[in-house]
Amino acid sequence: MKLNKFKIIFFIIVLVILIVLVGILGFKWSKHHEVETRVLKNQSDNTNYIEKRDKSVKAPKKLKTVVDKKEPMYGQIDKYLKETHFNGTVAVFDNGKLKMNKGYGYKDIEKGKKNTANTMFLIGSSQKFTTGLMLKQLELEHKLYLNEPVKKYLQWFKTDKEITIKDLMLHKSGLYKYEASTNIKNLDQAVLSIQKRGIDDEIYHKHSYNDANYLVLAKVIEKVTGKPYVQNYYNRLGNKFHLKHSAFYDEKPLQNEMAKGYKFKNNSFSFLRPNVLDQYFGAGNLYMAPYDMGKLIHILQQDKIFSSNVTNPMLHEFGTEEYPEEYRYGFYVTPYLNRVNGVFFGQTFTAYFNDRYIAILGTNIKNTNGFVPNEDKMKHIFYNILNQKKPYNTPGVKVHDKHHINQ
């Protein structure tokens, strides 16, 4: 009799445990299913925000073509770009003053529309620079912490090995390379696909450049602020610093200034249709005039985004405990200059800068064999014409203020 009672009690306990486990697993599955159901909706918060914004935004006042005739170097840049058949727009600032802003060739070859100072280029990975600035803002506001795991902010973003916010920022997450698809319709769907693919053990905690990292960061920014990425961009950078010649790919008021990207093959130009931009918030769907990028960089240099004790190490240190590598927050700090760069759908957008000069080239023709690549044009302009050959940043040296730079 006692044995039967024991069996009954044991059976009841096991049954209760099973019911609890099933309940827990069911809850977790329902939460994950809820995430999947939500992200599978094609309409996103970013799209909704842009549609509302379109109703109140007007095209900005036109920028004028500028070539400073008082200093011969700008005429030399103009001559060089013509000789190398440059198709795009150049902007150069000297100590924050605009010295050159001029378009060359065509932004829309089929319709014969020329590039001007106002042309906005698809900046590709240069957008990671703006994502990085917003990430740093949230870090300083104590809304996120670099050394904490991503799953603290995106509870459903589970991986076999722990990934921190810093891993994403430095491209050391080990996540598989992002594979864009026309079946993916928004940022949420992109990040879910990244989570499902998981980690490549061979590159875990090794630098491996990957759009996936900044797409996930964009989602983290949305999560901790409770606002769409686009709204964060405008609140924190675009509207705040009057970047009027920049816009996301689907903003209607500035469509007329957005360049079309091309490749040149068999003596003809082919349009490269950017058909996956709806999933690239944070990592490649922003259009920008070179003027606006120069303006943003100068604003950063003037400590108008962060205090000097944050800005100076960010812009000058590498090989230190805080900044062990050249790459951080979407841009590079190197011995001779700082660099922002992006390449996407035939368009290349590159900025070189130091404490005196900021030079930006945006082009909408893919690098072609037999022509001077965009990066080589940048090097010639910065090193040879502007004569910026002196070391700028010193490895392993901590920087507190501008007085310590190169000392």
Please report, for each region that a protein language model flagged, where it lies by residue.
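Catalytic loop of the DD-peptidase/beta-lactamase superfamily, centered on the K-T-G motif
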Residues: 2-94, 98, 276-407
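Short active-site loop at a secondary-structure junction
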Residues: 84-89, 111-167, 201-209, 281-284, ...
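Alpha-helical scaffold elements that line and support the substrate/ligand-binding pocket
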Residues: 90-92, 96, 122-143, 168, ...
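Amphipathic coiled-coil signal-relay and dimerization helices
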Residues: 98-104
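A generic structural motif
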Residues: 105-107, 364-365
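The feature captures the short pre-catalytic strand/loop hairpin that immediately precedes
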Residues: 110, 189-200, 265-278
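Active-site helix/loop module of the DD-peptidase/beta-lactamase fold
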Residues: 122-125, 138-175, 224-261
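Catalytic-site signature segments of enzymes, centered on catalytic residues
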Residues: 179-251, 280-284
